[in-house]
Curated annotation (Swiss-Prot):
Chain positions found as Phosphothreonine: T200
Induction text: By stress conditions e.g. heat shock.
Function description: Acts as a chaperone.
GO MF, any single term: ATP binding
Organism the protein comes from: Xanthomonas oryzae pv. oryzae (strain PXO99A)
Protein family membership: Belongs to the heat shock protein 70 family.
Protein name, entry field: Chaperone protein DnaK
UniProt keyword terms in alphabetical order: ATP-binding, Chaperone, Nucleotide-binding, Phosphoprotein, Stress response
Biased composition (Low complexity): 605-623
GN (gene name): dnaK
Pfam families named in the record: HSP70 (PF00012)
Amino acid sequence: MGKIIGIDLGTTNSCVSIMDGGKARVIENSEGDRTTPSIVAYTKDGEVLVGASAKRQAVTNPKNTFYAVKRLIGRKFTDAEVQKDISHVPYGILAHDNGDAWVQTSDAKRMAPQEISARVLEKMKKTAEDYLGEKVTEAVITVPAYFNDSQRQATKDAGRIAGLDVKRIINEPTAAALAYGLDKKGGDRKIAVYDLGGGTFDVSIIEIAEVDGEKQFEVLATNGDTFLGGEDFDNRVIEYLVDEFNKDQGIDLRKDPLALQRLKDAAERAKIELSSSQQTEVNLPYVTADASGPKHLNIKLTRAKLEALVEDLVKKSIEPCRTALNDAGLRASDINEVILVGGQTRMPKVQQAVADFFGKEPRKDVNPDEAVAVGAAIQGGVLAGDVKDVLLLDVTPLSLGIETMGGVFTKIIEKNTTIPTKASQTFSTAEDNQSAVTVHVLQGEREQARFNKSLAKFDLSGIEPAPRGMPQVEVSFDIDANGILHVSAKDKKTNKEQKVEIKAGSGLSDEEIQRMVADAEANREEDKKFHELVQARNQADGLIHATRTAITEHGSKVGGDVIGKVEAALSDLETAMKGDDKAQIEARTKTLEEAGQSLYAAAAAAEQGGSADAASGNAQASKAADDVVDAEFTEVKDDKK
């Protein structure tokens, strides 16, 4: 059995970790970084860029550079959160045939958010494979604790498209608690994990206890907001900069995708700088132009102004903390430690708000960017049997149930129930002689069914005719360790049963997933060919440069026929490099190498010939010297002078 890797698939950045010698180790990517931007770009020439390389070219390719797609995964296009996002991103978001939110490139290619996320997961997979020197096929992937069933299913689908068997989906705060608490001694403790990442917010109250020599991590309660994160903080800064520029220049930069992408980068940089300084300057020369000429943006931003812009967002994160504590039956004073996770928690205003609410300073010894991936790797180690004596008891974040008469939401499994779990409830018919019932499965907390998230609808038919209220239909809910739901309905009299694994009511069909898997495989082959072509071109380019240098240095020493052959080989290779035929480039590179060797050989021979002539002259001089007789001379004085 190979390694089960741990992946934190983040909104802004992703991270991969493995268990290595009993310790979790975060693996550096090919650029030498421990985290990878969750950004995917499609270039004009068909290349797919992932991570830092995609981020670097975002300003010049905004409509084909996709970031923060985690906020779209498993969502309907009509969701309020998706509609809000449309005005903040330069790329296209549109409705797929099933109502899901998909993204679109500038040449109208449509893709599911799962496909974009799969590209990031592939990069994480490759990072682990390069380090381990072996294939990786299994992973534990983290999701926000407050992700619903559709979003969890969609994340598993992304893993499948990336060629990964997702052994477990675990909640990000729970993973962070594993990373924090695995090696900690000192008895039972209750911790709060406040996880404010790039696009989502979670808080979990977790009890860490020693039970019969086993370390038990039990989630007591969880809450959150899957559309609150660093992206929203960035957007507040962008809106402020756009408004200030509009006041000054009368130009609305929201209509310019290129300017919007530059503003996004600048806003993120300014926000980060203001975590360690009191003031920064956003300076974007040539941000746009009008009839009067180019326009430059230069705006000072203070920490106080930033805090005023995002104050309501920070407050918005505190209410779920209050709810989670209440659900756990605890007070803030009962919490022993507060752990901060997610890059946005580096903001002093956020740290202060958390300290004020819990009445204690959050711990600073947990890396907010890496803790979640480390926890995922530990869970992978538990599943593989490499990590012993650890038990993880997670919960379902939202209540699950069905719609009953009058549009009422009847809960079958309450929120914060430890998973895996099963629960059943018996219902009956609403009309006389009803032969079928429709089971409408929902997730949420509202009393009215229509305000909750619809997960699935299915029919149980073949019920024997009887007066209303007589038939007994047992509806059973079964949540697995990934937090994914299976539902069955059974007529107790006839034992007829209908089972369904909840596929995100929207979501991808098996056929779509298979197509995307095949597409990813084809792209992997295409990417491999592309990189081989680039390597061949780079090698050829280096040889051309070296050969031209050799001609400059040695051309005067060799005959014209040798130089002619080298020049011809150079010209042939340069022509080949304009095309995409790798075999031709390699063949002509070899020809130039051989021509270059003949140039060096001719130059060396010419130099040796020169040396031989010099040696012959020296020999003659030596012989002449040998004929001279040594003599003593006596000075004769001329007295006649």
